[in-house]
Amino acid sequence: FDEHSFAGNEDSHRVTFAYLFDDKNTKIKSSYGTGFRFPSLYEMFFVYASNSNSIGHVKAENSKSFDVGFEKFLPDLDLNFEANYFNLSYDDVLEGWKTGTSSGSAYTTQNMPGTVKSQGLEFISRWMPNNYIDFDLNYTYTSTYDGAEQDDPDKNSSYTNAQMVRVPRHLINLKTNFSPSNFKNLNFILNT
């Protein structure tokens, strides 16, 4: 339970489940949780307008998440891989908007109407041929839905049901971690 002097009170919960099979190399797992994000000082108080009294009241974003996954380790190959499904939804998302005031327009942060949804699949693999080096290859597919029930103020066009901005549909990560005895750690990471 958290209390915020401007944005109200919020609580969050999480439940998890995991089962390790008898071979000790296979696991299924799942979780469900709720969460929130209080507005930052910038989001609460920044307004670009001729009238500085146009600061709006904002409340916390709320989220619900669910995931289920499968993990397998192949000891003969020193290979670990996972497959996961995730589903998230957000309400009262904090966004910057142009609003009308008695003295004209103002750009400020408001809670967006509608529900923003995100779901996808994640595949993770790690190969550890020895104690000094390992290789990770991850792929994530994300489908998002912008549930706002209003127009984009910058383009005056509807963006309901649109893919979220700055959320890639396809994401691939390649990572190499090298830990020789004379170095603490050396990493190479490639994101596409």
Regions found by a protein language model. Name each.
Residues N9, Y19-F21, T34, A60, ...:
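Residue-level signature of outer-membrane beta-barrel architecture
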Residues F1, V47-G56, F66, S103-Q110, ...:
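Extracytoplasmic loops and strand-loop junctions of Gram-negative outer membrane beta-barrel proteins
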Residues A7-H13, L41-A49, S54, V93-S102, ...:
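Outer-membrane beta-barrel translocator domains and adjoining extracellular loop/strand segments
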Residues A18-D22, K27-K29, K59-Q119, M128, ...:
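Membrane-embedded beta-barrel scaffold of Gram-negative outer-membrane proteins
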Residues F1-D23, F38, D136, D151:
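Signature of Gram-negative outer-membrane beta-barrel scaffolds
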